[in-house]
């Protein structure tokens, strides 16, 4: 064998030639060797000839004619598909015909014995009975249609569909002219449907025609042509999915024109502006939630998007059905949301409303975020408060309600601010009075009281007057709140009966004496000249008023009640000096008559009403008074009757026109004085009187604004008494110039009026 590369045929021929030259003797020896039995190839296992392949560098069995025949018999060989190499082998066999025939192995005549696969013979097919789902129906009316036949046969089972055309597998046979013959074929999906149709539909009648149903049998008509290409259904998966779809319980879609998928998406514009989210990014979530709540009324929402960077303020809402989207468009188009008129329309299916953030915007956003992180904690809190206030100042855009008027939020904000303004002055007044009471406890001297009087006027008088004159409702609300808190205090009576009463009595006496000395130097002998009150007199009167206020504030800080201080002082005076109290009561009657006369000039009927109410309240309280103090009360009543006459003469000298009301006021005053002795153990009654007094002087303030400068001093005194209304009864007794010892009567008068 040469070392050149030969192709397969040349190489095979070369091997045959070499076999002729060198292999005849060996073959003869192998065949004539009787010592061993031949194997299946006709050769001894140990006598198999090998040859060396120079190209592959290996030994291979030597190819002989017997080897080729055996190989063809084992691995299948047909005469029609003989290869050229086999032809060459035949040529070699012709050339070696002189060899004995026994050397040739017999060629196999039956290929099946050698392991060749048997191919299925092409011919007519037969359907197995257990898999046959076809039903043949005869006796149908000649005018029956395919739809009517489908409707008839579908009553007994699911009709199979063609996987490619998706049409029902039914057939109505026709003759040569195209007319219906009256028979048809139906293919069911399950075998059970065939049995059901045989039981129920067989021998049934339709329009007078009797039907006959049987299992379909397929027969060959004519001769079978095997040359025709056999139809193959390779779409097994498609067929299986079609069957599963038919077996599904879900109903089929409604027949009708199908709408596009993008018609289910609604585009809403002008919902917001991108700048709205810079101050408060959380507004985005609020708008999304409001839109979700509103759109859920029209149907099921599948998806909701807000394009926060779009300049038109675009939002998209995806519904389940196009009809729901149509309803949403019809309802929301043209409505108002957050002060903006929105528009709603169906999505065209192509427009992309997503606006990407530019590199510049991204850099600015990152810089702002970095600045926020580097800022101290205090500035962060300030920025948060600024953002909250900015969101409150946003106005109509923050309403975020459909079809809402833009000014609603502003009105609500104004109401809130007004309510806060009403409450703030009241709290400030209480706080200042408490501070003043604490300062007065440190030093109860007259000089200290006078020094602190300008400060107290600035703190108490000015804010109280401004709040009461500018907004009367505010003072009324404040007094009501104080009344409620005082009336609801059950601890006041127990505190008054405590051992602290002795020390408080002494303190009150010292204060009253100091006030009396100060008032003697400040009194003006000309009592009738009320119009000529000088600035010195006004300042002195203010000082005396402030001293009484400080006495009341001292009592408030000590006991938490506004009447206990003065009542304790009154009790001390009655116990220690009976005659001195009678003198003070006479002067008190005069002062009360002055109040009555001036009230009559001002045409203030509120005082009468309040005094009557006080009388009725005190009548109820008299039933619960202790019997041990009745004697003192009777003595006081007789003294008051004698003092009433003196008060009347004093009022006539001043030219006041209150004679018609003196008797009524005197009766009310008698009741007031009778109660003063009994109120030592019942301070709860004083709280109710205090509430009535506050209402009285608030009415006086509203009436005093209408008069001349002649009554300005009285107005000021009345306003001061209003400021002290929560602290001490009838503060109006300090009007005008007072007689000697009037400052002492101020404090005792407040006690008697309780």
Swiss-Prot record:
Comp. bias (Polar residues):
405-415
Species lineage: Eukaryota, Metazoa, Chordata, Craniata, Vertebrata
- Does Cell wall biogenesis/degradation show up as a keyword for this record? no
InterPro entries linked to this entry: Nucleotide-bd_a/b_plait_sf (IPR012677), RBD_domain_sf (IPR035979), RRM_dom (IPR000504), TatSF1-like (IPR034393), TatSF1-like_RRM1 (IPR034392)
Q: Which organism is it from?
A: Pongo abelii
Q: Kindly list the positions at which Phosphoserine occurs in this protein.
A: 387, 403, 407, 409, 445, 452-453, 481, 485, 494, 498, 521, 529, 557, 561, 579, 597, 600, 607, 616, 624, 642, 676, 702, 713, 721, 748
Its name, as the record gives it, is 17S U2 SnRNP complex component HTATSF1
Q: What does this protein do?
A: Component of the 17S U2 SnRNP complex of the spliceosome, a large ribonucleoprotein complex that removes introns from transcribed pre-mRNAs. The 17S U2 SnRNP complex (1) directly participates in early spliceosome assembly and (2) mediates recognition of the intron branch site during pre-mRNA splicing by promoting the selection of the pre-mRNA branch-site adenosine, the nucleophile for the first step of splicing. Within the 17S U2 SnRNP complex, HTATSF1 is required to stabilize the branchpoint-interacting stem loop.
**What biological-process terms (Gene Ontology) are attached?**
double-strand break repair via homologous recombination; mRNA splicing, via spliceosome; protein localization to site of double-strand break; U2-type prespliceosome assembly
Chain spans, region U2AF homology motif (UHM): 259-353
Which SUPFAM superfamilies does the protein's record reference?
A: RNA-binding domain, RBD (SSF54928)
Quaternary state and partners of this protein?
Component of the 17S U2 SnRNP complex, a ribonucleoprotein complex that contains small nuclear RNA (snRNA) U2 and a number of specific proteins. Within the 17S U2 SnRNP complex, interacts (via UHM region) directly with SF3B1. Component of a complex which is at least composed of HTATSF1/Tat-SF1, the P-TEFb complex components CDK9 and CCNT1, RNA polymerase II, SUPT5H, and NCL/nucleolin. Interacts with GTF2F2/RAP30 and POLR2A. Interacts with TCERG1/CA150. Interacts with (poly-ADP-ribosylated) RPA1; promoting HTATSF1 recruitment to DNA damage sites.
Localized where?
Answer: Nucleus; Chromosome
* Listed Acidic residues bias regions: 539-552, 564-579, 591-606, 613-633, 640-651, 675-713
Span list, region Disordered: 1-53, 81-122, 380-415, 433-754
